[in-house]
């Protein structure tokens, strides 16, 4: 019986995929197809929630099949991330876009990311205090116990790593290993490796212009192929969003969400407030925040459904260049740094809120100015090297809680609402990286104002 029901659910999913394909054949815009996929996915997931239990075998098996589309799409995006970073950053050097301002660009982007992470921590602290979020009364079930065991194992490895060691991990000892994304800091390491190649190219160009020109032509060909691959993968976005949203909604435990409703509500209020702060920073830079919102919404939608900052990188870079008018070099640096440094959601709001929740259980008044200022500083500094894939928020929370000498068990006790909150956190992470790129590009005079101010209908569509 279960097999039949699973088959029906999968058949419905395939029909919905067919609807999106029909819309594509009718040349419905990319943005409209993404929004349609988001809405249909939520409705389909809610229907499955209503008919079955979230923990039922039918839902679990159906979600496994849905994962062929949703998770498969995310994996394709992750496949292209490292080649895209490597080729794009080297290409920026060969086109002389980063020669003069490399240090200024890197410093400004990282500075904005760290600053906004500190602000995000303050917002998380305010939300926790405003909603009186507390760890008191949280119950530990089987799922929480299993998660706690994993958390403690991970904490043991983190505890042994000193701050100098963490900084050394950013350097690429084996760039080919980092191209596989094997380490949490692989993205930053690839950026550094690509920058070294770019700097070496500039030196070779002065002494051996013929060899440099040959390298540039080869790189241009590789760059064209990689960007074509990106375009092909991004065309699948509506299908990926549909499957990811349906899977997430269908598998969410409503009862568990209601039990931690105050924490979920406080988290999303903090996320929304921080997103508004992004818009304010853009406005203060002399740009129209409404234009930004309209142009990046499809990217944020995908980040929300996929829960992967790294997976959203190709969309992120494409939107910065084609929609916002950000120069290629800055777009690549901002997206790359934003995956591992200064994530406003995962490394800013989330660790700060957990620290505020657990502090009273060990006799600390979380509203003491000294505690708050220390927490903000620790969160900002600890935001280096947080992986842009699932689990990055846990990694950041463990670092912050251990540095503040607070119990780490709280990380396991909120597992039931982790997927729901992680969706909003990831969208904020991606918005933070694009905001950093946009503001940096504006301040350095690298922004194409005409592209930024154009209506969406006049600019080239993502994945067109």
Swiss-Prot record:
Cellular component annotations (GO), alphabetically ordered: plasma membrane
The residues that cross the membrane are 3-23, 34-54, 73-93, 107-127, 184-204, 225-245, 263-283, 347-367, 371-391, 395-415
Which GO molecular-function terms appear in the entry? L-cystine transmembrane transporter activity; symporter activity
Where does the record say this protein resides?
Answer: Membrane
- Signal peptide residues on this chain, from the entry's feature table: none
Membrane topology per the record? Multi-pass membrane protein
User: Which InterPro entries did the record assign?
Assistant: Na-dicarboxylate_symporter, Na:dicarbo_symporter_sf
Task: Could you list this entry's UniProt keywords, alphabetically sorted.
Answer: Amino-acid transport, Membrane, Transmembrane, Transmembrane helix, Transport
The entry sums up its family as follows:
Belongs to the dicarboxylate/amino acid:cation symporter (DAACS) (TC 2.A.23) family.
Q: What does this protein do?
A: Mediates uptake of L-cystine, the oxidized form of L-cysteine.
- Descriptive protein name: L-cystine uptake protein TcyP
Which species? Answer: Bacillus anthracis
* Phylogenetic classification of the source organism: Bacteria, Bacillati, Bacillota, Bacilli, Bacillales
